[in-house]
Amino acid sequence: MSISKATRIKVYEKYGGHCAYCGCELAYKDMQVDHFVPQHGYFQTGSDEIKNLMPSCRTCNHYKRANPLELWRVFIREIPLKLRSGNYIYKVGLKYGLIVEHEHPIEFYFERVERERAEAQGGES
């Protein structure tokens, strides 16, 4: 189903013109609309509701594909392991300190924005 221009504008504005996942700035024309819960996760209706649509850059939309968020989070977390196991240039970069790996929780941009909004509202008296 095609998403209307009015809906696309609302999706674009959800996170102030940023990708909901990595947080990069998006030009409206470059935004891709991602289904937060994959379309096959809905029973016929609901997949194109605003609450299920996320502004996404091409890279994030490509790699998230039709995966649920937690599966994609695991995929991202495992990137260094995949690079170490099969990429000679990456191994050399690690060996010479050109690449430094950091283990930290994967927090998507929309999660950070929503957490900060909640903290700001909680701090108001």
Model regions and ranges:
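Short cysteine-rich clusters marking metal-coordination/redox-active sites
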Residues: 19-22, 57
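A general structural-boundary detector
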Residues: 6-9, 40-44, 59
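Histidine-centered active-site/metal-ligand motif
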Residues: 35, 61
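Short linker/helix segments within small regulatory modules
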Residues: 37-53
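Short hydrophobic alpha-helical module
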Residues: 22-25, 39
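Extended charged
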Residues: 1-10, 24-28, 51-54, 62-125
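Canonical RING-type zinc finger of E3 ubiquitin-protein ligases
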Residues: 29-33
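Sequence/structural segment immediately N-terminal to covalent heme-attachment motifs in c-type
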Residues: 10-17
